[in-house]
């Protein structure tokens, strides 16, 4: 597995490179945003570890540009910016995980391995595949086991949000803010109703079931173990 680290702090970059190399990865290190973006665009990386506060080009812009260019490798943001607003922004832009400095290397390594295991979701330019679910973001075509599925505009947006964060627990509040652009009202069941309708189209007549309920929190899209 080949990783790219984009980190301008020399000691942190060297520490990450040494630890991940010893863990069996091939590692490239870029010490500024411009070089990191160039390597990410031209190299064949399985995962990127990306700082946000970088010289030349910041991490926010790198995530945005990579996703706009249909680069689908997992991105782990590693940064000192630790507010909820920063975390939500990173996920909204298309990052797959977010870890705040200072960090424990064991946790970072576990997160890297988890992201790499999420190979069940394959992004090929504008296409997602999870199990037998196929989604084309450009044509907005959705099929499961070869059967065409018709979604409303909002159902498609909700499904796309699940796909971009496959394997992550998504709280109802985050779904509300990112898919409906509204604050979550705990007295309404709007999110649950929308998810139920989406399940009715992509899960009810198929196996395995992909949208999982995380009781008391929200939802997660993943292929169940053993499937």
Swiss-Prot record:
Coiled coil: none annotated. The modification 4-aspartylphosphate is found at residue 51. Residues 2-116 form the Response regulatory domain. Residues 125-223 bind DNA. One of its GO terms (molecular function) is DNA binding. It holds the Pfam family Response_reg. Keywords: Activator, Copper, Cytoplasm, DNA-binding, Phosphoprotein, Transcription, Transcription regulation, Two-component regulatory system. GO terms for cellular component: cytosol; protein-DNA complex. Its main location: cytoplasm. It comes from the Bacteria. GO terms for biological process: regulation of DNA-templated transcription; response to copper ion. It is found in: Cytoplasm. Phosphorylated by CusS. SMART domains: REC, Trans_reg_C. InterPro entries: CheY-like_superfamily (IPR011006), CusR-like (IPR006291), OmpR/PhoB-type_DNA-bd (IPR001867), Sig_transdc_resp-reg_C-effctor (IPR016032), Sig_transdc_resp-reg_receiver (IPR001789), WalR-like (IPR039420), WH-like_DNA-bd_sf (IPR036388). Member of the two-component regulatory system CusS/CusR involved in response to copper and silver. Activates the expression of cusCFBA, hiuH and plasmid pRJ1004 gene pcoE in response to increasing levels of copper or silver ions. Can also increase the basal-level expression of copper resistance gene operon pcoABCD. The cus system plays an important role in copper tolerance under anaerobic growth and, under extreme copper stress, in aerobic growth. NCBIfam families: cztR_silR_copR (TIGR01387), PRK09836.1 (NF007346). This is Transcriptional regulatory protein CusR.
């Amino acid at each position: 597995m080949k990783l790219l680290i984009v980190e301008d702090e020399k000691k942190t970059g060297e520490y990450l490179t040494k630890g991940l190399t010893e863990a069996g990865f091939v590692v490239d290190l870029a010490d500024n945003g411009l070089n990191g973006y160039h390597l990410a665009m031209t190299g064949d990386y399985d995962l990127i570890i990306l700082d946000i506060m970088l010289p030349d080009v910041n991490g926010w812009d790198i995530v945005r540009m990579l996703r706009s260019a249909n680069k689908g490798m997992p991105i782990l943001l590693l940064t000192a910016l630790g507010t909820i607003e920063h975390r939500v922004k990173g996920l909204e832009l298309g990052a797959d995980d977010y870890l705040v400095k200072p960090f424990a290397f064991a946790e970072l390594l576990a997160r890297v391995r988890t992201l790499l295991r999420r190979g069940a979701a394959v992004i090929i330019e504008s296409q997602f595949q999870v199990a037998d679910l196929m989604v084309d973001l450009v044509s907005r075509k959705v099929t499961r086991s070869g059967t065409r599925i018709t979604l409303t505009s909002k159902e498609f947006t909700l499904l796309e949000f699940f796909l971009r964060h496959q394997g992550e627990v998504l709280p109802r509040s985050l779904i509300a803010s990112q898919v409906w652009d509204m604050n979550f009202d705990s007295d309404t069941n709007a999110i649950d109703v929308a998810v139920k309708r989406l399940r009715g189209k992509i899960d009810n007549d198929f196996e395995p079931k992909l949208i999982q309920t995380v009781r008391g929190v929200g939802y997660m899209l993943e292929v169940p173990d053993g499937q």
